[in-house]
Amino acid sequence: MQQTILAPDTADEALLTPQQALLTDDSEAILRFAVDALSAGMGAALVMLTGIRGGAARAVGAQMVVREDGGYCGFVSGGCVESAAAFEAMAALACVEDRVVRYGEGSPWFDIVLPCGGGITLHI
């Protein structure tokens, strides 16, 4: 699988908002992204799709990794919740606390609706 590395908007500043840093859904590359972040002294969070209600774009076990600077790689949906999930992961890193987040059906957020009409549960 071909991988594309995307540069942040500004090279001189740390990312303040989540931004995809590596475009891949290969689990080995996603975990390597985490190892590289940790080796560089940066915090990183693993986000895993652990539940599906109705339909979903990805299977249970899909992963993404989010660095403390907001850079992320991997997918847990068809692209509709990755940025929101990255914000949650950054918050989890900041308070050093795991969390469970739901999007779509059964979620507390009315403005994040999955195109497939279902819902997903993520563990961070």
Give the residues covered by each predicted segment.
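Segments forming oxygen-rich coordination pockets for charged ligands
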Residues: 1-124
